[in-house]
Amino acid sequence: MNKMGDYTSETISHIDREFIQDLIRKGERIDGRAFDEYRQIEIEANVVPAKAEGSALVRLGDTSVVAGVKVLVGEPYPDSPDEGVTMVTIEMSPIASPLFELGPPKEDAIELARVVDRGVRESETIDAKGLCIEEGKKVYMVFADVYPLEYDGNLIDASSIAVNAALLTTKFPEMKLEDKKVVATGNMLKLPVKNIAIEHTVSKIGDKLIIDPTLREEFVQDCRLTMAVDQKDNFTALQKGGGAGPMSLDLVDQAMGMALDNVRAIDELIQAAAKDVE
């Protein structure tokens, strides 16, 4: 089965494959970027206020995604009675790319959701205890849904940026338990966001590394490494995928350096987008 960023050779011609690989060997990329350079990033927050408590549209070059956040009330898990729940899902539609198919979530959609979800969970982006309404009875449940609109590579990073921007701008009604019923207090709350972690994806092509791969670059990659980096430069999650090619420890160190070089600028874009809707 094809995996995200690891499609069959029929998707790209042999000539294109050789051309891209040859450029990389020469230290060049098809769009003229440096190996450690992201495409232009644009973030627009609160794009669907009527349908979500928080939302964001992200354009990463010619890749674009929208993330929407819904906050519901539910019961906590038995092993964490005083903690709320946060979950990331994704719906990959043929509208974004003919590579995506209608129907139940495929392996690539599940993988993408897991990677982005792990970045949120492992960094403890949301203070789970701050989502508790009444211990053991009711908590807030936060669902971040991602919808790719256009796909030209690196859905992971685009989705991560969109989810973080949407979470930062989420406002929802405060609820309380009264006579065993959930009722609104009339107040509005913001999510207890305590740590932002941005995911950075680096592709290995031959013995070279490039950050933020385009779709054509994903077609020829040997593998990729996705790293979640928080605001204190901590690496909170790592995931290798996109192919079975090996990646040495030296290359992993190099990839981590690329991520650290970019995290501050992207975080500033997210924070600026969030301030625009305050």
Language-model region placement:
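Polyanion-binding surfaces on beta-sheet-dominated domains and ring/shell assemblies
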Residues: 2-278
